[in-house]
Every structure is written in structure tokens, then in C-alpha cells.
Amino acid sequence: MSDRHEDGSGATAAQDTQDAHAAHDAQDAVEQAWHGVVATARRTAAEGLVVGTSGNVSARVGDLVLVTPSGVPYDRLGPGDTVAVDLEGRQVLGELTPTSELPLHLAVYRNSDAAAVVHTHAVHATAVSTLVPEVPLVHYAAAMLGGPVRTAAYARYGTQELADNMLGALRDRTGCLLRNHGTVTYGSTLDEAYDRTAQLEWMCRLWLTASSVPGHSPSLLTRAQLEEVQDALKGYGQPG
């Protein structure tokens, strides 16, 4: 009897240790993700993609979504300000109120394999959102976002209607414009999501610049040319 009891105690102790390690790893993952969210949000401000407390950034860790809070300057956020919700939007970490654009972020995570979302009010992209239903193919960088970038119909910020409009524009894409509002991009990492935002803003600036020359219209790529680039991009970057 004593041997069986000791064996059971040993198994229980081993399981407790394993659970403790798993909990520690999960906590580390959350802390690292929050650090990345804050760093990326600060980067959007530093590089002029947002003004003040506008825009928002999120990252997914398992069934948790870590997201910037509403109305708090990014340079004031620290390790103790973690804000996290579940995929239904219920807050599970932190005391600060999540961003008002939470429906937008959750819609992306529920309908894609995204691990990060970046939303900005980048000035050139927002300007283009007021002009066209789709960003003209002025550069092959559009391939990095899955194809010609669409403009989602306008709806008030923070609404499910806006989130639904965004999903339509994101079909087979990793980024879109929000009419009279800004940009949304997502990726498998925060760096990838941010890079797609930067590429989108740059393309919009390029098109506005080329379009402003009197008496000339920018030459545009064909869909076939863009598809050729998409094929070439499959081998882009470092292996592994």
C-alpha cells in the first residue's frame, strides 16, 4: 500500500511541476506579446502613422488577445498595464479599458490565422481611402498584401458594422483601407503586420505623388504582372 501511495504522490508531484512550468511558459508568452504590442504601437506613433492616442495594435496568444487600451498614450504603457480579452471580447487581464476598435481586431482573429493586427490612421492611406474603392496597382508591393488593396465602406469606428465591412475588404488579402478612417493589416507576427502597414502607406503615398503631376496619369501594373510577382515572392527572404 505504501509503495502505491508513494508512486501516486510522485506522479502527482511530477504533474504539479509540469503544470507549473506550463503556467510559467504561458505567462512568459503573454509578457513577451504585451512588450511587442506596446513597442509596435509606439513605432506607429514615432513613424507618423498615428497621432496622439489614435490607432491600435493587438497580438494573439492562444485564446487571448492582447490589445492596446483606449485613450492611453503609448509612451505611458508599461509591463503592468497588460490588457487582454478572450475571443468573445470578455476582459481577462488588466484594469484599463480595451481599445474601442476591439470588434475590428476580434473579427480578424475569428476569421483568419492572424497572430497580430495593426490599425492606423496613416495620412496618405487615409487620403486614398476617400478617393478610390481599390488602391491602383502602381507598384508590385501590392502582392505583399495578397493583391489590389480594397477600401471598406464607411461605418462609425468601434462598431460591428465597420468590422463586417472590413472583413469583406480583407477577403483573400492581409490588409485594407477603411474609408475616411485608416488602415488595417494583419500578419503572423507583429513585425509582419507592421511591415504591411508601412508598405500600404508607402504605396498610397506613391500613387498620390504620381497622380499629382499635371497632364500625366501613372502607369499601372496588370493583374497578370502582379500574379507573376506573387509567384516570385514565394521564394523571397531567408530559408527557414
Segments and roles (model prediction):
Residues S2-T12, D16-G240:
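Glycine-rich flexible loops
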